[in-house]
Amino acid sequence: MRVLVQRVSSAAVRVDGRVVGAIRPDGQGLVAFVGVTHGDDLDKARRLAEKLWNLRVLADEKSASDMHAPILVISQFTLYADTAKGRRPSWNAAAPGAVAQPLIAAFAAALRQLGAHVEAGVFGAHMQVELVNDGPVTVMLEG
């Protein structure tokens, strides 16, 4: 499982022109792009959720837990792109939707259980993501 984390001052995700998740521009939050690969499981999803919740990448070296910062979770199978051969990426390392969807849902649920305010995109949908990366700060978590 990979989680590409960006510290943001605001973010929104739209599906069919409608906002389905957002971080308001009145503070800091995190956008978590989540990719799932073969062999990932619920334990890995929970561990990465806890790591993200306590990751000290916000202002003054604080975590989302410290600041009660919102987290926008967006599924992104392209985190497992293989570009080693040719000009077209291979997606073979990404888990199929039937495997990935429940693990991404479990990741978001684990964050909520820890106390996070979680917004989310729509799994499998074509989404438009807008964000203002603050810093910029971008970190890759892998489990």
Curated annotation (Swiss-Prot):
GO molecular function (one): Ser(Gly)-tRNA(Ala) hydrolase activity
Enzyme class, broadest EC rank: hydrolase
Coiled-coil portions: none
Keywords attached to this entry: Cytoplasm, Hydrolase, RNA-binding, tRNA-binding
Annotated compartments: Cytoplasm
Pfam family, any one: Tyr_Deacylase
Cellular component aspect of the GO annotation: cytoplasm
Domain of life: Bacteria
Motif Gly-cisPro motif, important for rejection of L-amino acids, residue numbers: 135-136
Catalytic activity: glycyl-tRNA(Ala) + H2O = tRNA(Ala) + glycine + H(+); a D-aminoacyl-tRNA + H2O = a tRNA + a D-alpha-amino acid + H(+)
EC assignment: 3.1.1.96
Protein's job: An aminoacyl-tRNA editing enzyme that deacylates mischarged D-aminoacyl-tRNAs. Also deacylates mischarged glycyl-tRNA(Ala), protecting cells against glycine mischarging by AlaRS. Acts via tRNA-based rather than protein-based catalysis; rejects L-amino acids rather than detecting D-amino acids in the active site. By recycling D-aminoacyl-tRNA to D-amino acids and free tRNA molecules, this enzyme counteracts the toxicity associated with the formation of D-aminoacyl-tRNA entities in vivo and helps enforce protein L-homochirality.
Note from the entry: Was identified as a high-confidence drug target.
Recorded domain comment: A Gly-cisPro motif from one monomer fits into the active site of the other monomer to allow specific chiral rejection of L-amino acids.
Family indicated by similarity: Belongs to the DTD family.
Identification of the protein by name: D-aminoacyl-tRNA deacylase
Organism for this UniProt entry: Mycobacterium tuberculosis (strain ATCC 25618 / H37Rv)
Gene behind this protein: dtd
